[in-house]
């Protein structure tokens, strides 16, 4: 009877040890997934802002060039377009991490609207170089330009809100899973 009691206690101890090891492995897995989800959330937000800030930078530089005629702003504009390419790099990084079809559609919408600004920006720069400062200002401060900027900003806000909600939900789910394993 004592050997039976030892056998039962040993069995219970082994089962408890197996359960403990399983819990530790599960917690480790969830913890790694949680760290990855947090890193991805940060990277997605960073690169979304990189994309949007690149676009805003181009607007600021073309407007500064139209206002002042200073070559520095013209050079900054084309350096962003030709070399830095923050918009493209931001989108590439987000796609590599993983975005939804809806998020990609919003990026495409913002890009399409941004591309409608290019002819206006081009005309503004040509007018500055020809000495027609008022015409240049009319291109980059006119209703067509401002309408596109307003639309881009509205999509941008929705995009950031959707991205934040999606990535936060993933993080919160993993946090709940971690607490369930701990608890």
Residue ranges: model-predicted function:
Residues 54-55, 68-162, 166:
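Heptad-repeat alpha-helical coiled-coil/4-helix-bundle sensor or tether segments in soluble regions
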Residues 31-32, 151, 169:
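N-terminal sensory and localization modules of signal-transduction and trafficking proteins
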């Amino acid at each position: 009877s004592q050997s039976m009691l030892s056998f039962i206690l040993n069995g219970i101890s082994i089962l408890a040890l197996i359960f403990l090891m399983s819990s530790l492995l599960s917690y480790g897995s969830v913890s790694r997934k949680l760290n990855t989800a947090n890193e991805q959330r940060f990277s997605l937000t960073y690169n979304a802002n990189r994309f949007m800030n690149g676009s805003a930078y181009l607007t600021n530089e073309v407007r500064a060039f139209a206002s002042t005629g200073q070559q520095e702003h013209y050079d900054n504009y084309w350096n962003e377009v030709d070399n830095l390419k923050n918009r493209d790099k931001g989108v590439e990084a987000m796609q590599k991490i993983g975005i939804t079809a809806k998020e990609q559609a919003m990026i495409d919408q913002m890009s399409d609207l941004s591309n409608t600004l290019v002819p206006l920006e081009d005309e503004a720069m040509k007018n500055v170089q020809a000495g027609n400062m008022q015409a240049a200002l009319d291109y980059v401060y006119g209703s067509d330009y401002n309408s596109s900027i307003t639309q881009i900003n509205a999509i941008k806000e929705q995009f950031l809100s959707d991205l934040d909600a999606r990535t936060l939900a993933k993080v919160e789910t993993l946090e709940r899973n971690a607490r369930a394993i701990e608890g």
